[in-house]
Regions:
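Flexible helix-coil transition and linker loops at the boundaries of alpha-helical arrays
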Residues: 51-60, 87-94, 124-144
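Canonical tetratricopeptide repeat
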Residues: 65, 99-100, 146, 153, ...
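Start-of-helix register in tetratricopeptide repeats
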Residues: 25-26, 59-61, 68, 95-96, ...
Length: 194
């Protein structure tokens, strides 16, 4: 999955939030521009301003932008904290957010939490609760790749938790859906030895 594309998508979504106060709009726009330019210090400053807004939607978008800034810098613990605050504050919940939360938890080796986020994102995708991915991706390709990544990571989480039966089952289901994935074929072979 091209995570850079995912980051830009999330940043663009941040700009789409309705803003009334020009200061808020400027912070969102400046934060997105700084993030896209790789100026993480400036992006962080702008998104932090946005988190201080009294309007919960604006504040939530600030936390999401802040999370993306941390994520891009591979500060996964801080990114996960910011994503949690975004969700708690009322950001529009999408499969993408739960995928990124799952990746952050995996990077910090909290596989139980990662599994919860991944499964929440997959459930959301299956019931099409968010609908955001289809609207915001070119012909759904990005969304399909993200779902595949999440299913792969679900197997990895079960493996890291030494839950061999669930890992085997999910690997088998994955290979039915994605039969040409040689990495998962090797993973499934390994799991059969457990």
């Amino acid at each position: 999955m091209k995570i850079k594309k995912q980051i830009v998508l999330a940043a663009v979504l941040c700009m789409a939030v309705p803003t009334v106060a020009s200061g808020c709009a400027n912070s969102a726009k400046s934060g997105v521009e700084a993030l896209e330019a790789g100026d993480y210090k400036e992006a962080q400053a702008q998104f932090e301003k946005l988190t201080e807004e009294k309007d919960k939607k604006k504040s939530a978008e600030g936390y999401r932008g802040l999370a993306m800034t941390y994520y891009e810098q591979e500060e996964y613990s801080s990114a996960l904290d910011a994503f949690k605050k975004a969700v708690d504050t009322g950001v529009v919940q999408t499969t993408q957010i739960y995928n990124l939360m799952g990746v952050c938890a995996m990077k910090t080796e909290d596989y139980e939490a990662a599994l919860e986020y991944i499964q929440a994102g997959l459930a959301m995708a299956e019931t099409d609760m968010s609908g955001e991915e289809e609207k915001n991706s070119e012909n759904g390709k990005d969304s399909a790749e993200m779902i595949q990544e999440m299913r792969y990571n679900e197997v990895v989480c079960y493996e890291k938790l030494a839950d061999w039966e669930n890992a085997k089952q999910k690997a088998s289901e994955y290979l039915i859906e994605y039969p040409k994935d040689t990495a998962m074929e090797r993973e499934a072979e390994f799991l059969e030895t457990r």
